C-alpha cells in the first residue's frame, strides 16, 4: 500500500551551501537521509516532496552550519497482508516465481500458483500445469494476494509471500479467459 505521509524534521545546512535556495538544499539533505530507506512503521521511502524550510535557522556552538525546521511529504510503500497486487514475473525457479511489485519483489511458491499439479522446465525456464497446460514464464503479468510479510534485518526489504490460488488471481491472461 502506498502512503502519503506529512513529516517534520530539522535539517543541517552546511556552510558551503549558504546563499543557495534553502528548499533545494533541504530537499537534497532529506533525500540523503530518508529516500530509498526503510523506516519503522512507515515503510520504504520512495520520494520526498513539497519541502517547506523555515527561513530562520539555529546555530550550534562549534558547528558552522545552520539548522532549520522543515515540513515535507514522503511517499512510502508498505506491503499489507490481504492486499491484491499486480506485477511482472521477473524470475522462474523450481520452487516458484518472483514477481516485481514496483518498489519490492514478492515470491509465489509453486504450490500457490494454481490448483493444478505443476512442473518446472529448466530448459525453457517455465512452470506449466500437467492437466491445464497453463504456462507461466518471465515477463508474464500476474495478479496475486499478499499472504505474509516477513520482516528481516532492519534496513533490509521484507520478504513478501504471495498466492495466486484464489478466484480472479493468477496470470492476467488466465483471468480474462476464465471470464469468457
Swiss-Prot record:
UniProt GO cellular component terms: cytoplasm; DNA-directed RNA polymerase complex
Entry-linked InterPro entries: NA-bd_OB-fold (IPR012340), RNA_pol_Rpb7-like_N_sf (IPR036898), RNAP_E/RPC8 (IPR004519), RNApol_Rpo7 (IPR046399), Rpb7-like (IPR045113), Rpb7-like_N (IPR005576), S1_domain (IPR003029)
Record domain S1 motif: where: 82-165
One annotated GO molecular function: DNA-directed RNA polymerase activity
Reactions listed under catalytic activity: RNA(n) + a ribonucleoside 5'-triphosphate = RNA(n+1) + diphosphate
Main location group: cytoplasm
Superkingdom of the organism of origin: Archaea
Compartments where located: Cytoplasm
Known EC number: 2.7.7.6
Annotated GO biological process: DNA-templated transcription initiation
Matches recorded under PROSITE patterns: S1
Keywords: Cytoplasm, DNA-directed RNA polymerase, Nucleotidyltransferase, Transcription, Transferase
Family: Belongs to the eukaryotic RPB7/RPC8 RNA polymerase subunit family.
HAMAP family: RNApol_arch_Rpo7
Record's subunit section: Part of the 13-subunit RNA polymerase complex. Forms a stalk with Rpo4 that extends from the main structure.
Stated role: DNA-dependent RNA polymerase (RNAP) catalyzes the transcription of DNA into RNA using the four ribonucleoside triphosphates as substrates. The highly mobile Rpo4/Rpo7 heterodimer is conditionally required for transcription initiation.
Domain topic, free-text comment: Forms 2 domains with an elongated structure; Rpo4 packs into the hinge region between the 2 domains.
Protein name in the entry: DNA-directed RNA polymerase subunit Rpo7
Source organism (scientific name): Saccharolobus shibatae (strain ATCC 51178 / DSM 5389 / JCM 8931 / NBRC 15437 / B12)
Gene label: rpo7
Amino acid at each position: 500500500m502506498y502512503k502519503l505521509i506529512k513529516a517534520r524534521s530539522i535539517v543541517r545546512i552546511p556552510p558551503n551551501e549558504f546563499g543557495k535556495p534553502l528548499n533545494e538544499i533541504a530537499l537534497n539533505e532529506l533525500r540523503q537521509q530518508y529516500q530509498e530507506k526503510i523506516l519503522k512503521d512507515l515503510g520504504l521511502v520512495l520520494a520526498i516532496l513539497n519541502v517547506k524550510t523555515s527561513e530562520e535557522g539555529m546555530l550550534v556552538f562549534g558547528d558552522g552550519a545552520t539548522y532549520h525546521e522543515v515540513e515535507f511529504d514522503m511517499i512510502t510503500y508498505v506491503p499489507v497482508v490481504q492486499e491484491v497486487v499486480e506485477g511482472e514475473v521477473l524470475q522462474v525457479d523450481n520452487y516458484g516465481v518472483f514477481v516485481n511489485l514496483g518498489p519490492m519483489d514478492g515470491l509465489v511458491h509453486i504450490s500457490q500458483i494454481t490448483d493444478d499439479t505443476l512442473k518446472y522446465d529448466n530448459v525453457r525456464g517455465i512452470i506449466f500445469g500437467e492437466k491445464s497446460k497453463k504456462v507461466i514464464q518471465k515477463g508474464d503479468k500476474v495478479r496475486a494476494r499478499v499472504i505474509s510479510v516477513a520482516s528481516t534485518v532492519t534496513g533490509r526489504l521484507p520478504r513478501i509471500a504471495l498466492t495466486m490460488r484464489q478466484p480472479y488471481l493468477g496470470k492476467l491472461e488466465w483471468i480474462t479467459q476464465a471470464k469468457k
